Amino acid sequence: MEEKYHPSPDSPTEIPFHPAHASYLKSLVTQAGARDPSHLIFGADRHKYKLNPPASLEEVRRFEEKHNLLLPEEYKFFLTQIGNGGAGPYYGLYSLEEAERYTEYLETTQTAAKQKDEEVPAPAFIDRRMTPEDWAVRMEELDNCSDDEYDSLMYKLCAGMLVIGTQGCTYDTVLMCRGSERGKIVYIDWNLEPGYGPFFTGMPFLYWYEMYFQEILQDHNLTSYGYLCLKSEEEFVKDFCEMDKKTGEEDNNMDFPPLNKEQLLSSLFRFKTAAAETIDFLAALKEPELDAMRTELLFRFDLHRGREVFEQLLSGSNPDAAICCARRLP
């Protein structure tokens, strides 16, 4: 399948893998470092907005051959033209050498894992066709299997998956190299809970990388980068108002993964301030199941309006939501 670059509106070129774009991304890293000189943004004290020297094409090819993996073109462009790891979301990006430490279940396919004499690429398990039930069943299998069976199941689970960075604790950043999400970023919690599967950001690698630094330059909240959609305030209000008008057929044609109203509303936590129109929208919103979240957002953007809505909820319209909001406030 042909890979396509998804530029931001500020990108200098829409030509994939152009040298000008490599220069542009390096410039974004430098600008972000100047905006955060004390490295206060989460993870910045680790990578310090520094990129490693680029890898050679030969180094990339050796990595691919060793792991029977075809790396996405965007990622190869990054490695060879921008940097072999370094500055990036959360604690930054691993170099190919660092990524080697996390390839235990990548070095062989499910066939090679059993027979040690074949290398047939295994299909990606982490794929948009995977349902929450599929994930839960696989996790239950992992909990109730022998050591040999565990390794075999993990090879299947990790097929086509390359860990390229960490968010801390048990959360890692994964670049998918096979399946529907090839070239896109997925977040995974290695606690491997049956009820909590991988998070599909839906973002191609270069877009995910670029927008992280754009968010820094726009002084947005980076706490949950990649988990929250990167819409503007205007786009958010427009899309939210149109959600009730969409048919099931239209939902099926949406970019993956589709968002529900709660997920869309939560995207506003990226912003430290909001326009008067956004504040008015939140104050007037009539969605009882979203009352706690919209009130928390109002407290963030306009303390007076937040207090007004909070008192309305507490006095009778939705006291449970008011209590929930109070518990979530710092």
Residues covered by each model-derived region:
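Short amphipathic alpha-helical segments that mediate assembly, nucleic-acid/protein binding
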Residues: 21, 132-138, 233, 261-262, ...
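Short, flexible helical or helix-coil boundary motifs
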Residues: 1, 32-36, 113, 216, ...
